[in-house]
Design a protein with these regions (language model features):
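C-terminal motif of bacterial Sec signal peptides marking the signal peptidase cleavage site
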Residues: 14-17
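Conserved SGNH/GDSL esterase-like catalytic core that processes O-acyl groups on lipids
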Residues: 40-136
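Second-shell loop/turn segments in exported
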Residues: 89-93, 104, 122-132, 142-145, ...
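Catalytic His-Asp segment of secreted/periplasmic serine-dependent ester chemistry enzymes
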Residues: 162-247
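A short helix->loop->beta-strand "cap" motif at the edges of active sites that frequently abuts
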Residues: 149-153
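N-terminal, intrinsically disordered, polar/charged segments of Gram-positive cell-envelope systems
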Residues: 20-47, 58-59
């Protein structure tokens, strides 16, 4: 991402009132069909860790090896929530299929790059608790990665927007307000990246329509999971950013 956009993202001030979601459990995994893989080369070296929208990189088959990709780390549920326990989570280790701790996976794999994407799960709680809680949870995870795999290049990816059609019946806020919360969380995530000298990539802006919602063509039926085309756009944005940093 161009440096100017990074600066603009991190300096935008968003003021939103705190609301409470009726059910703040992680958004569930849904089955998505396989599609054509992306040919982005830099992303071939990345391990992806995050929520169900990250797991769907595998479900959509957009990474090399399609649904058999070993580039996505996730628990059996297919989703994680960024909280104080995330660093102690168990994942299904793709190389063996066994369930091991994230710490063990980092030590075994020593990934060249690890891309983190968090924010939608628990978004309203993060806003209600304030930036210190969100940053604490993210920093804890970053510290674990640095400790267990010090040579890994850590990428913090922005959380993705939701579509206007998303069912908001479990929330006490509108889709527009939830997107404003996501924007705020992305600013906080950017600040974590800056503090630690990490790469922050604003993929969210590549998915938004003129009103800030997830574009229709990038939205699955539920309004928050993504289409294969959306993932190709995301992977291209990541690839382009990494390529620009190499040049």
């Amino acid at each position: 991402m161009p440096k100017l956009l990074l600066i603009l993202l991190c300096t935008v001030l968003l003021f939103t009132s705190c609301s409470t979601r009726k059910d703040d459990a992680p958004i569930s995994l849904t089955v998505i069909e396989e599609n054509q893989a992306s040919d982005a080369s830099y992303t071939d070296d990345i391990i992806f860790l995050g929520e169900s929208t990250t797991y769907h990189l595998k479900s959509r088959g957009v990474l090399p090896e399609g649904k058999d990709t070993k580039q996505v780390w996730a628990p059996k549920s297919g989703t994680l929530m960024l909280d104080p326990t995330v660093k102690d989570c168990m994942i299904v280790y793709p190389e063996t299929g066994e369930e091991i701790s994230l710490s063990d996976a980092l030590t075994r794999k020593n990934p060249k790059m690890l891309c983190l994407t968090f924010g939608l799960n628990g978004a309203t709680s993060f806003i209600a608790r304030g930036d210190s809680y969100f940053k604490y949870c993210y920093q804890d995870l970053v510290d674990l990665i640095k400790e267990k795999s010090p040579n890994t290049k850590i990428i913090i990816n922005s959380c993705f927007p939701i579509a206007n059609k998303m069912d908001m019946s479990r929330y006490t806020i509108t889709a527009e307000v939830l997107n404003s919360y996501i924007d705020t969380l992305n600013i906080w995530a950017c600040s974590i990246a800056e503090k630690n000298g990490l790469i922050f990539i604003d993929t969210a802006s590549t998915l938004k329509d003129k009103d800030g919602y997830l574009m229709t063509e990038y939205s699955a039926d539920d309004g928050y999971h993504l289409t294969a085309e959306a993932y190709r756009v995301i992977l291209k944005a990541i690839n382009d950013t990494l390529q620009n940093k190499e040049n």
